[in-house]
């Protein structure tokens, strides 16, 4: 049965609400090094780990499985070629997808192909019977000679696919941009990045908070949601 984008959006939003109060489920996160969350957190939790603590610990969903299938350096096309291994074999109920930071190395000419691949990821995830959630990658430090400059076009592609296919969107990029603008600190809030392309511990915590808000599980009384991480804003990335 075919649904309109609006019908998909309404259905998936309701599914996520039901999942959070229903029987045990499997949550799978796919993406690149930001999802994998290695090195740049310096031993602190990545956003997927914060999610697991919030859902399995604080919300008492102990039997839930949270799978981090992120791979450093991965692009959307890599997931498509390894979809069954990185996502399908876990029989997921919900799949969170975040790519773009590496994909943008293809430049402006690569945006159309990237958008098509996201479309295919959404369709293949839905074919599994799972609910898909798209995420925009957080901003990076834009430099003319940096291989990841020009990410904004890929962020817009994620938003476009989410709107066209009725996919729930976690817009990390918008949240980071809003805070950075309020601070006058550039493309990313001060202290949220560990290097020009990777969030540090504070950045991952803020990504988790954005995810919680999108899913409606943010709570000021939660230890995870109210955690504070001190950052050194005097040292440039």
Identify the residue ranges that each predicted region occupies.
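Alpha-helical cap/lid subdomain in secreted, periplasmic
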Residues: 10, 21, 49-62, 75-236
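Serine-esterase "nucleophile elbow" of acetyl-processing enzymes
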Residues: 1-72, 83-91
């Amino acid at each position: 049965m075919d649904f309109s984008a609006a019908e998909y959006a309404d259905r998936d939003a309701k599914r996520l609400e039901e999942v959070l109060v229903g029987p045990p489920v499997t949550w799978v996160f796919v993406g690149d090094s930001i999802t994998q969350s290695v090195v740049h957190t310096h031993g602190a939790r990545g956003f997927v780990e914060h999610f697991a603590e919030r859902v399995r610990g604080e919300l008492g969903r102990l039997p839930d499985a949270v799978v981090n299938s992120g791979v450093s350096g991965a692009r959307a096309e890599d997931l498509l070629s390894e979809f069954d291994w990185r996502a399908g074999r876990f029989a997921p109920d919900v799949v969170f997808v975040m790519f773009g930071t590496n994909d943008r190395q293809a430049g402006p000419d690569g945006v159309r192909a990237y958008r098509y691949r996201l479309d295919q990821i959404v369709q293949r995830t839905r074919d599994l019977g799972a609910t898909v959630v798209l995420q925009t990658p957080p901003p990076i430090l834009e430099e003319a000679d940096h291989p990841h400059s020009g990410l904004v076009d890929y962020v817009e592609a994620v938003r476009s696919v989410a709107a066209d296919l009725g996919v729930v969107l976690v817009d990390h990029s918008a949240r980071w941009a809003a805070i950075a603008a309020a601070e006058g600190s550039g493309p990313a809030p001060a202290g949220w990045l560990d290097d020009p392309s990777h969030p540090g511990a504070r950045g991952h915590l803020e990504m988790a908070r954005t995810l919680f808000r999108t899913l409606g599980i943010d709570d000021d009384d939660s230890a995870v949601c109210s955690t504070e991480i001190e950052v050194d804003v005097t040292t440039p990335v």
